[in-house]
């Protein structure tokens, strides 16, 4: 499926697709006729999974819809976690592979990039790979989404979850930090989940207190469109000038450092082949090749 609105097909009544730009399309009938083995055979290559701008359900890309202010004018809660990338970064990252990949990908900007995402050891290379994925795939996207809510009147409430769920030594996720989905049991006040990665956690009173607070925010938001209420730390609507988020760590506070976007702006926004659109602080990139092949490299690791 295509997630880029600039790449569309001209499907005629015979069901034939005409490729107008990358990636290549095939007729819907052919896709429906594919066997399960055919589908499973190509599944490992489908790194990205995003909405398709089909001109009907989605008349345009999500980015363009928000840029034009055509999204539903309703409040939103959005956010990301401090260590989103730990669950998506392979252990096979190597020091040489990481450094060579950065130099190949970023050319004259490589040294600046490496100063921001350094790698002097295999462990540091892996940690930097985690940070790249966390920033580019989650942190940047959530911040951009919050900024683009300026095109409508409803507010966005941005959070940054940095609490590391406690886990017994030896647990498969014990060293994953504030990993992808770590906030979910807190939000729904349910520490009894039995599926990984949130099972077998040694949640304590700090966790239960955070959970009570987060669940209250979500209940208030569902009822009124505003997460705030009596006894809760004030959660301000996102203001691009203040650039703050509600940080949920060992305590709850409003924090500018939680956004952690200085490094992604510095390291990525000035790359020569990326066109940054400064419109209410939002950024996009110019081509399918740049957008998707670059992120595929970042996601899969250079090692």
Residue ranges and their predicted role:
Residues 140-143, 147-303:
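Mobile gating loops/cap/lid regions near enzyme active sites that modulate substrate access
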